[in-house]
Amino acid sequence: MSNTKKPLAGALFFAALLSANHAAAQNASGEDLFKQQCAACHAIQKDAPPGMGPNLHGVVGRPAGAIPGFAHSKEFKTALKGKSWSPELLDKWLENPQKVAKGTYMMYQQPDPAVRTAIIDYLKNIK
């Protein structure tokens, strides 16, 4: 393969890899996506202690920052004071937490709306 074709082949391979990952995410359940992308930091079982992030059991509809014993950042407390975790707010949060509360501890971002929706739909059913 010539040197001029190698970058193109690499770019095509990378695009195919991204497309395959996107398709796999589209076919995964919200529970699977939660386990893959959220469970390392967040517990989901009722009464489980928080991990790196707060316990997300019953998060939909709960006031933001309402987990006893979890130390939210000052930025989080200021930006989300008086707000509850609606599906819409969770969607914005998962897309880019720093846009919702600049300086918050959470760094995870999910650009894919279908993945965010699947995770949020899963969280709606954890009560």
Predicted stretch roles:
Residues 86:
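ATP phosphate-binding glycine-rich loop and adjacent ATP-lid/helix-beta elements
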Residues 108-113, 120-126:
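Short, exposed beta-strand-loop hairpins at the edges of beta-sheets
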Residues 26-82, 92-102, 126-127:
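Periplasmic/extracellular electron-transfer cofactor-ligation site
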Residues 1-10:
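Bacterial N-terminal signal peptides that target proteins for export
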